[in-house]
Amino acid sequence: MSRLLRGAALAALTLAAVSTAGAAGAQSYNRLVVFGDSLSDNGNLYAVTGGTTPTSPPYYQGRFSNGPVFTELLGFNVGRYAAGAPVTGSINYAFGGARTDSQASPPGMRNQLLAYTGAGGKFGANDLVSILGGANNIFQGIPAAGASANPQGSIAPVALSAAADMKFIVNSVAAAGAGTILVTNLPRLGTTPQFNQGAGLPASPLADYAGTTFNGALLSGLMATAAAQPNTNIIMMDLYKISDTLSGNPGLFGLTNAKDACFNGATVCSTPDSYLYWDGVHPTAAGHRLIARLANDYLYYGDLGAQNAVLGETAWRHREDALDGSTASLSGR
């Protein structure tokens, strides 16, 4: 039985993650392969648009943030695991704006996987594969759903279809021989600046509904995949679980503002490292460092360790200081 399935059972189906911290920590990764959207894009959309999207600066070298994204920071905690940036042979197929489906431009996540395998790409037992997506499906579906007679009934198929895409991608990667897959669910979308204020506020409940619908279906899909692919460790990093904690008490994580966007489309705030959000939906460099630390904890400690680390301020601070020190030059801090 896969670790994801055991972890979900032990947590009474509340969270899918590795169940044995020691086993997770012992895993060695030689390469990182990334499929996803703007939260993982390290400059791919910027390159294909001739350096026009996103506008850099103020965006950082084609990232949808003011610094490196979390997948570039994995592995900077010395002694944990080998995947990270820079890592020889690592591959990033993520594109800003990508949905989970087979859209042509920017390449949807199904197409990202097809492009990788079509070019002869393979997966190995020591690969760490990061898969994160679904938000763009929901963002693009909310306007029409919100204007319909049944907003929840209209957005639910969008969320469920995105989760089905994710299941397909994860299952395909596992069947192709990947040793470990880190799948990230969606945070509580209603707490992002795009939906927690201004014109987007009325859509906040619908965004939350869509996100939880997606997350529930994603978990079910991952459990089924875990049962069918016993040789792959499938780990779900639960961003939703920490959303309210982050919003309610950002100081625990070294932040002062988890509500507003640092960059409002015209001006940049004076203290971006104290903000969780860079723009309406994307994390700041500080936010990405936080996600990277959380990912490290999930990969090394498993669910229980990750949960305790997030909620334990002292333990969190020790790891935060270590990671910040090792990534300062990369992030320009």
Description of each model-found segment:
Residues 3-4, 13, 18, 23-333:
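Conserved active-site regions of diverse hydrolases
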